[in-house]
Amino acid sequence: MACRSHIQPSDLACTMQLALAWIILGACGGSHQFQARSQGHLGLASNLGTNQVQLAGDLQASGPQPYMMIQDPDSQAFPLPEPCCPSEMDTPETSGPGIFPPRCRTPSSGCESFLGHLQRALRNRFHLLLLGVRQAPPLCEELCQNWFATCEADITCGRTWLWPSGKRSCEGRCRTYGQTFADGVDLCRSVLGHILPVAAPGSRHCLNISISLLPRPRPGRWARETISQRSRRRGTGILDAGGSGSGSGSGSGP
């Protein structure tokens, strides 16, 4: 059963699980440095056309960041869980407390950005639960499919990111999303379980991440040359048409 919004003893456990999911997304996915205070002005906005709740706001520049500990300025720091796929890591231990060593592979910018947006969505959902707001919407199927497509070639912690025993279920070697999950729905249900249920296909009231917020890959040299050649061809065609018209006009004159 999905977590309800009213803060009662049982719901408090759901709220804490949701906070853990928010933390694990950074630990397994590679996102921005976690801090106790909110950064940026991101929130949830309702799409009146589809009744879907989407992440909205200004996103600060993002890029691969080192894995740091969660730290509250008013409390002692505590480290995040161990990094994913430790068996393939051949790196010395870090000197600072609570700092993650590198993982198997640096995450792609697209996957890292997507997980950063998803973390913010979880944070907003967490706040709604604490405020006693009505039950937050489930994840849109489109969000799960976009997550899978964006991170398909990236490394994942395993099929389950939330463990009752507190231990990871990493296999002997690092595996990609594509090797681990069948599709986006399988990804969401396996990774986040009942904490963030997936809405039925075509549902109009669910949590989605607008693709327009994600960074688009810059076109390569070949793509830029192709676009430039097409532009020149279009421009030449227009000039030729104009020139022939001008020539026809001059020829018909006295």
From Swiss-Prot:
Domain of life: Eukaryota
Disulfide bonding pattern of the chain: C104-C174, C111-C151, C144-C188, C157-C170
Keyword Membrane attributed: yes
Signal peptide feature range: 1-29
Assigned GO CC terms: external side of plasma membrane; extracellular region; interphotoreceptor matrix
Membrane topology, from the record: Peripheral membrane protein
One GO molecular-function entry: riboflavin binding
Pfam families the record matches: Folate_rec (PF03024)
PTM summary: Not N-glycosylated.
Compositional bias annotation for Gly residues: 240-254
Location in or out of the cell: Secreted, Extracellular space, Extracellular matrix, Interphotoreceptor matrix; Cell membrane
Keywords on record: Cell membrane, Disulfide bond, Extracellular matrix, Membrane, Secreted, Signal
Region of interest: Disordered: 227-254
Function: Riboflavin-binding protein which might have a role in retinal flavin transport.
Family, similarity comment: Belongs to the folate receptor family.
Listed name of the protein: Retbindin
Organism listed in the record: Ictidomys tridecemlineatus (Thirteen-lined ground squirrel)
Taxonomic classification: Eukaryota, Metazoa, Chordata, Craniata, Vertebrata
